Regions:
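Polytopic alpha-helical membrane proteins, predominantly small-molecule transporters/carriers
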Residues: 36-38, 50, 64-69, 90
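The serine-hydrolase catalytic nucleophile loop
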Residues: 42-53
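Catalytic nucleophile-loop/oxyanion-hole region of alpha/beta-hydrolase
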Residues: 71-105
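Feature marks short, surface-exposed loop/turn motifs that line or immediately flank catalytic pockets
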Residues: 24, 39, 70-72
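Conserved alpha/beta-hydrolase
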Residues: 53-73
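Short beta-strand element of the alpha/beta-hydrolase
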Residues: 28-37
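N-terminal cap/lid segment of alpha/beta-hydrolase-fold proteins
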Residues: 1-27
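Primarily recognizes the serine-hydrolase "nucleophile elbow" in alpha/beta-hydrolase
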Residues: 92-133
């Protein structure tokens, strides 16, 4: 498995930082984007996204997990984040993932409640949303 520290600039010029976990295979792979909740981090509650990313890589599936603006290692302060900011950050993360050479865009899966509204402005061939309610 390969673990990469990644970052990119969102549409507001802030740096979002995250972690990509890839299987040892070459070429494009099915890919999951994990999005944490309002006050979370890219590791998830009790490191659930870390554990899930490793389990997915063992099955040949890559994944990315980012800290939203104002959370974790990304730019900004928590008190400056907003739901609109979460929405646009999610869109920017989806767009970033779709441009990566290792992502099979046909098999890009978004996992988060916020994703249910954020993906509408990003064009994907296939999208599955998991909602825990």
């Amino acid at each position: 498995m390969k673990i990469l520290q990644v970052q990119f600039q969102n549409r507001n010029g802030h740096t979002l930082r995250g972690i990509v976990t890839l299987p040892d295979t070459e070429g494009k792979v099915p890919f999951v984007v994990h999005l944490h909740g309002f006050a979370g981090s890219c590791s998830g509650y009790k490191s659930m996204y870390t554990h899930l990313s490793r389990a997915l890589a063992a099955q040949g599936i890559g994944s990315a997990r980012f800290d939203f603006y104002g959370n974790g290692e990304s730019d900004g302060e928590f008190e400056d984040m907003s739901f609109d900011g979460l929405h646009t950050d999610a869109q920017d993360i989806f767009a970033w993932a779709a441009q990566q050479p290792y992502v099979d865009i046909v098999k890009l899966i978004i996992e988060a409640a916020i994703a249910s509204t954020a993906f509408f402005n990003v064009k994907f061939l296939s999208l599955i949303i998991k909602y825990k309610g």
